[in-house]
UniProtKB/Swiss-Prot annotation:
The lineage of its organism: Bacteria, Bacillati, Cyanobacteriota, Cyanophyceae, Synechococcales. The gene is folD. One of its GO terms (biological process) is tetrahydrofolate interconversion. Homodimer. GO terms for molecular function: methenyltetrahydrofolate cyclohydrolase activity; methylenetetrahydrofolate dehydrogenase (NADP+) activity. Keywords: Amino-acid biosynthesis, Histidine biosynthesis, Hydrolase, Methionine biosynthesis, Multifunctional enzyme, NADP, One-carbon metabolism, Oxidoreductase, Purine biosynthesis. It comes from the Bacteria. This is Bifunctional protein FolD. Belongs to the tetrahydrofolate dehydrogenase/cyclohydrolase family. GO terms for cellular component: cytosol. PANTHER family: C-1-TETRAHYDROFOLATE SYNTHASE, CYTOPLASMIC, C-1-TETRAHYDROFOLATE SYNTHASE, CYTOPLASMIC-RELATED.
C-alpha cells in the first residue's frame, strides 16, 4: 500500500510546537511575532489564501496585519507601504499576496521588502543566498515539501529528482534546495521534449506545472515518490458540482508509487506552516531568542 504524505497532520503537529515556542519566549521578546500581508485587488482565491494565513497565525499566536488595497492603488503607494512596514518593529514578516495585476512591477515590489522580513523568500538577496547555500529565508512551498519528505525519512541525498515547473515560487527555489541537499535534479517545463520519459526516471517526481491531472501512471516509475503541488477547482459537465484536484491523476498513480501527497491536504497546509516558521525565525533573530526553532521541524 502506498504511503500518504499527510501534510495536514504534520502541519498541525508543527503548529503545536510553534505555539509552545512562542508562549515560552514571548516574555523575553515582550510581544508576539507579527506578520503583515499585503493583498491588492479582489481576486477570490487570494482572499481565501489570505484568510487561511490569518487563521493559522491566530492558532499559533502570531499577530497578523492585513492590508487590503484596491486595484486602483498606484505602484508608488504600495512601495511606500512596504517601506513603512520595513521600519515597523512590530512586524517580523511581510509578504505580498500573489498574483497581482500586471499593471504593477511585481519584482520591484518584492525587492522593496527587507530580506530579513521576506517570509516568502522571493527577494533577490534571499534567492542569491539560496544559490550559495547560505542561511536565509526559504520559499514556503519548497521548504514545506522538504520537511514533508524528511518527516517520513524519505532520503533526498543521491536521489534523482525531477521537478515539473520553473516558477520563482516553487520550481526554481525547490530545485536549488534539492541540489543543496545533494540530490541530482532535473527541471522540466512546458517546452521540455519527451517529458514522459524524463519523469519516468525520477525517484522523486514533483509536479508544479499548473495543469490539472497532467501526470498519470505512464509518467511514474514503480516505487517512486510523487509530490503534487498543483491545486485546481474543476466543475462537473452539468456545472452542478465542483471538486479539487492537483496536477497528478492520483487514482491512476497511487497503485504504482511508494508515497504520494494528496490534494487537498498535502503540500498546501505545509506551505502555510512554513510561512509561520519563517515569521517566527525572523522574530527569534530580532530578539536573540533560543535557537531551538530548527528542532521543532522534522
Amino acid at each position: 500500500m502506498s504511503l500518504k504524505l499527510d501534510g495536514k497532520k504534520l502541519s498541525l503537529e508543527i503548529e503545536e510546537r510553534l505555539r509552545n515556542y512562542i508562549l515560552t519566549n514571548k516574555t523575553i521578546a515582550k510581544r508576539n511575532p507579527g506578520l503583515a500581508v499585503i493583498r491588492i485587488g479582489e481576486d477570490p482565491a487570494s482572499g481565501v489564501y489570505v484568510g487561511n494565513k490569518e487563521k493559522a497565525c491566530s492558532r499559533v499566536g502570531i499577530k497578523s496585519y492585513i492590508f487590503h488595497l484596491k486595484d486602483t492603488v498606484e505602484q508608488k503607494e504600495v512601495e511606500q507601504l512596504l517601506n513603512k512596514l520595513n521600519l515597523d518593529n512590530n512586524i517580523d514578516g511581510m509578504l505580498l499576496q500573489l498574483p497581482i495585476s500586471k499593471k504593477f512591477d511585481e519584482q520591484r515590489l518584492i525587492s522593496f521588502i527587507n530580506p530579513e522580513k521576506d517570509v516568502d523568500g522571493l527577494n533577490e538577496q534571499n534567492i542569491g543566498k539560496l544559490v550559495k547555500n547560505e542561511q536565509a529565508m526559504r520559499s514556503c512551498t519548497p521548504a514545506g515539501i522538504v520537511n514533508l519528505l524528511k518527516s517520513q525519512n524519505i532520503k533526498i541525498e543521491g536521489k534523482k529528482i525531477v521537478v515539473i515547473g520553473r516558477s520563482l515560487l516553487v520550481g526554481k527555489p525547490l530545485s536549488l534546495m534539492m541540489l543543496n541537499l545533494n540530490a541530482t535534479v532535473t527541471i522540466t517545463h512546458s517546452k521540455t521534449i519527451n517529458l514522459n520519459k524524463i519523469c519516468k526516471e525520477a525517484d522523486i517526481l514533483i509536479a508544479a506545472a499548473g495543469k490539472p491531472n497532467l501526470i498519470n501512471s505512464s509518467f511514474v516509475k514503480e516505487g517512486a515518490v510523487i509530490i503534487d503541488v498543483g491545486i485546481h477547482r474543476l466543475t462537473s459537465s452539468d456545472k452542478s458540482k465542483t471538486r479539487l484536484c492537483g496536477d497528478v491523476l492520483l487514482e491512476d498513480v497511487i497503485p504504482k508509487v511508494f508515497a504520494y501527497t494528496p490534494v487537498p491536504g498535502g503540500v498546501g497546509p505545509m506551505t502555510v506552516t512554513m510561512l509561520l516558521v519563517n515569521t517566527i525565525f525572523s522574530w527569534q533573530k530580532q530578539f536573540g531568542l533560543s535557537s531551538t526553532l530548527n528542532d521543532l521541524l522534522p
